[in-house]
């Protein structure tokens, strides 16, 4: 049987000093016989997705202690991508993922914790904690803060979210009053932004990986049902500890749950629900921490045969996360995929012996359990609040329409092409990604003129100054992990293209990335990035570029000889922006840039460089 890791600091005469310090935290004699379970919380008043988490760590802690464990809570940082968007603050967002992963490792290993409960929610926090969990490979369970309710206003016929507020603000025809109304209505409650943006996508994928309870990705932050997820997480982590440390059951370890097939399941779900392209970046990073050989080619392979079964904002205005929950949440999407033969159902989870068992219990179209049906009727109250579990509103009915509802069957898919695609070509030899769920079919094949910008800031100025015309392909480069540094999100450029009426008339290509709120022909993660010698750095104004989503290709329409000649010239100049950007790159950001890999590797640290130290 494996010993508790915590015995390192709690047992033996020589650990008297450490035990004295543990006692100073409130531990008693009997506690030294129990597993010490770390609670990695991410409460902060800066982020609406985390503002309600302050007391939830102790809610879990009390349940852990009732179940026979010792709970010790600590906090990680959390960056709000929406607030950091459009200025130098966005340089820090992706690097914060590595800081979060490291901070969890530091706390858990420094104090020899036996297991972890990860209380996450927003864009980089769930991925960072996931990376740490797979790196540490001790019992873990995730429980997120949950999505916010969609916004409501008399001026719009659909639910609102952050992106609506950004688009209307850039629309010169909109009155100040209308902009203010959208601003005040778009984000009414605590929780992660209400569409299938990065935060909600990742919380859903953690369910598919098997590391979270059903409902983790879709139960509203404000709903009282979410409290049960936190309580159950506390009980479950103690049970996982007993199985591993008491019964030598290694099947409960995160690397044995989130194995290669589980990563395929998670990516299959992502493609089926049209999730954020950022999820690709984060799954690739997490796979490396788990030492799993899961890469962009696997994602490309899956994207070619997985249909789109769910369409949610920003891909469609009709549905938000509250509607996904009403339709049965993630296990109903997994159920549709399983019945279509597209899912590995024999894999364990933290709550069921197998995915198949979980689907049988939690898919609303497969179970008659009234408690499950009641759970998925949890809905929005429409009352602005920053308080968790503050309302108990329920829909009168479920959305179990698999022909025309929010979630579809494989036979009635929104499209037989999934919601994400990987493109390759001479402009992105190692690949780039596009969220096809948000691209109008009329522009799945698009040939246009390159309009070059060497920073997000200059592209925004150019778009707002009407420099971009119909038929242009806006290229924003030197915004990758190294070149930014930090691989900024390009939500403002894509939102402003929409506000200018160019959403279906232009494309955008970047070695940066996109917010989960992005839609339109927006292609990111071009690899290698410009700063690493990628061909995106060789494109010139006016060059023709051909994007062909059906054939998964993207090419600069010049000869190989011309491309090679340009590379020779660029090598002489150096791979950096032509003009010096007014951007303060601190020591912290330089350290990230020094080790960062391109997006096709998940923008993680270059371990080969570190192994040589």
UniProtKB/Swiss-Prot annotation:
Pathway annotation from the record: Amino-acid biosynthesis; L-isoleucine biosynthesis; L-isoleucine from 2-oxobutanoate: step 3/4; Amino-acid biosynthesis; L-valine biosynthesis; L-valine from pyruvate: step 3/4
Top-tier EC class: lyase
EC number: 4.2.1.9
UniProt binding sites for [2Fe-2S] cluster: 122, 193
Disulfide bonds: none
GO cellular component: cytosol
GO molecular function, one term: dihydroxy-acid dehydratase activity
Gene3D superfamilies with a match to the protein in the record: IlvD/EDD C-terminal domain-like (3.50.30.80)
Catalytic activity: (2R)-2,3-dihydroxy-3-methylbutanoate = 3-methyl-2-oxobutanoate + H2O; (2R,3R)-2,3-dihydroxy-3-methylpentanoate = (S)-3-methyl-2-oxopentanoate + H2O
Active-site residues, record numbering mapped to chain: 515 (proton acceptor)
PROSITE patterns in UniProt: ILVD_EDD_1, ILVD_EDD_2
Protein keywords: 2Fe-2S, Amino-acid biosynthesis, Branched-chain amino acid biosynthesis, Iron, Iron-sulfur, Lyase, Magnesium, Metal-binding
Residues that coordinate or bind Mg(2+): 81, 123-124, 489
Cofactor comment text: Binds 1 [2Fe-2S] cluster per subunit. This cluster acts as a Lewis acid cofactor.
Function, as annotated: Functions in the biosynthesis of branched-chain amino acids. Catalyzes the dehydration of (2R,3R)-2,3-dihydroxy-3-methylpentanoate (2,3-dihydroxy-3-methylvalerate) into 2-oxo-3-methylpentanoate (2-oxo-3-methylvalerate) and of (2R)-2,3-dihydroxy-3-methylbutanoate (2,3-dihydroxyisovalerate) into 2-oxo-3-methylbutanoate (2-oxoisovalerate), the penultimate precursor to L-isoleucine and L-valine, respectively.
Subunit structure: Homodimer.
NCBIfam families: ilvD, PRK12448.1
Annotated protein name in UniProt: Dihydroxy-acid dehydratase
Native species: Pseudomonas fluorescens (strain SBW25)
């Amino acid at each position: 049987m494996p010993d508790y890791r915590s015995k390192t600091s709690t047992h033996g005469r020589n650990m008297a000093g450490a035990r004295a310090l543990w006692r100073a935290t409130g531990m008693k004699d009997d506690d030294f016989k129990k597993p010490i379970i770390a609670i990695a919380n991410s409460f902060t008043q800066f982020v609406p997705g985390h503002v309600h988490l302050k007391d939830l760590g102790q809610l879990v802690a009390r349940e852990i202690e009732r179940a026979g464990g010792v709970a010790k809570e600590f906090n990680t940082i959390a960056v709000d991508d929406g607030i950091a968007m459009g200025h130098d603050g966005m340089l820090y967002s992706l690097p914060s993922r590595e800081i979060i992963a490291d901070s969890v490792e530091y706390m858990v290993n420094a104090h020899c914790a036996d297991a972890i409960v990860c209380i996450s929610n927003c864009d980089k926090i769930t991925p960072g904690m996931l990376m740490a969990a797979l790196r540490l490979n001790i019992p873990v369970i995730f429980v997120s803060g949950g999505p916010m309710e969609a916004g409501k206003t008399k001026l719009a016929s659909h639910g609102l979210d952050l992106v609506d507020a950004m688009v209307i603000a850039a629309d010169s025809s909109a009155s100040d009053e209308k902009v203010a109304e959208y601003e005040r209505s778009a984000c009414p409650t605590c929780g992660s932004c209400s569409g299938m943006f990065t935060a909600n996508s990742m919380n859903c994928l953690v369910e598919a990986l098997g590391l979270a309870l059903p409902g983790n990705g879709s139960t509203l932050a404000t709903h009282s049902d979410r409290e049960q997820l936190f309580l159950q997480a506390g009980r479950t982590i103690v049970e996982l500890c007993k199985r591993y440390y008491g019964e030598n059951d290694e099947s409960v370890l995160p690397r044995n749950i989130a194995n290669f097939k589980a990563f395929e399941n998670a990516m299959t779900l992502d493609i089926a629900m049209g999730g954020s392209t950022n999820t690709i970046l984060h799954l690739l990073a997490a796979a490396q921490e788990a030492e799993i050989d899961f890469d962009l080619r696997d994602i490309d392979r899956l994207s070619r045969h997985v249909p789109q079964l769910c369409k949610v904002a920003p891909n469609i205005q009709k549905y938000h996360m509250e509607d996904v929950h009403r339709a049965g949440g993630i296990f109903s999407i997994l159920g549709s995929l399983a019945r279509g033969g597209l899912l590995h159902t024999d894999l364990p989870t933290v709550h069921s012996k197998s995915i198949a068992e979980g689907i049988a219990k939690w898919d609303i179209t497969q179970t008659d359990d009234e408690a499950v049906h009641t759970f998925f009727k949890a809905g929005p109250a429409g009352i602005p609040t920053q308080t968790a579990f503050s309302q108990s509103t329920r829909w009168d009915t479920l959305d179990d329409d698999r022909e025309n509802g929010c979630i579809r069957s494989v036979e009635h898919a929104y499209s037989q092409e999934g919601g994400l695609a990987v493109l390759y070509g001479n402009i992105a030899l190692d690949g780039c990604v596009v969220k096809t769920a948000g691209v109008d079919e009329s522009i799945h094949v698009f040939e246009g003129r390159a309009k070059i910008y060497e920073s997000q800031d200059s592209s925004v100025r150019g778009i707002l100054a009407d420099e971009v015309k119909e038929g242009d392909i806006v290229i924003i480069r030197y915004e990758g992990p190294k070149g930014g540094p930090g691989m900024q999100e390009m939500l403002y450029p894509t939102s402003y293209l929409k506000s200018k009426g160019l959403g279906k008339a232009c494309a955008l290509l970047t070695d940066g990335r996109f917010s989960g709120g992005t839609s339109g022909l927006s292609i990111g993660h071009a690899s290698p990035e410009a700063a690493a010698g990628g061909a995106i750095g060789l494109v010139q104004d006016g060059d023709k570029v051909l994007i062909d989503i059906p054939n998964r290709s993207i090419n600069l329409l010049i000869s190989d000889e011309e491309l090679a000649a340009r590379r020779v010239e660029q090598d002489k100049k150096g791979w950096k922006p032509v003009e010096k950007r007014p951007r303060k790159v601190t020591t912290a950001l330089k350290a990230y840039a020094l080790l960062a890999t391109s997006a096709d590797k998940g923008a993680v640290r270059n371990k080969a460089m570190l192994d040589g130290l």
